[in-house]
From Swiss-Prot:
Keyword check for Cytoplasm: yes
Organism of origin: Borreliella afzelii (strain PKo) (Borrelia afzelii)
GO biological process, one term: ribosomal small subunit assembly
HAMAP family hit by this protein: RimP
UniProt KW keywords: Cytoplasm, Ribosome biogenesis
Gene: rimP
Similarity section: Belongs to the RimP family.
Function according to Swiss-Prot or TrEMBL: Required for maturation of 30S ribosomal subunits.
GO CC list: cytosol
Protein name in the entry: Ribosome maturation factor RimP
Pfam families associated with the record: RimP_N
Source species, domain of life: Bacteria
Amino acid sequence: MIKCFDKNNEVYNLIKNLTERLNVEILEINIFRNKNGGKIQIVLYSKNFSLGIDLMTDLHKMILLILEANLKYSFILELSTPGIDRRIKSDKEFQIFEGKKIKLMLDNEFEEGFILEAKSKSFIFKTDSKELNVFYSDVKKARLV
């Protein structure tokens, strides 16, 4: 399992205060640059409320203002939410998605179950027939269902 994106990321540091105040998690930041500018993709999530189109539009406006005032290159900003079949990409995401149903691959087969509890090095995975303590390092693939 890979770790979360670099917290020294300039974009992350510029928007983290806003997202923390609004109780929104930054799951992923991708930055693509070329000679004409760039594209910034940010994936956001909230456990407490739905990030619907109206809220995402407001977030886009606020984040765009912050980034345009601080970044010295032109860019396109794309915001999205994780989606129903998101591949879980970091240990932190198991904590964020605690209680959610996932498909998990440890050996060569997927099993469906729930993330009961996420800890610092492992999580409890519950299927219909068992509960397992799974270390993040043992996870080959995981995705939301």
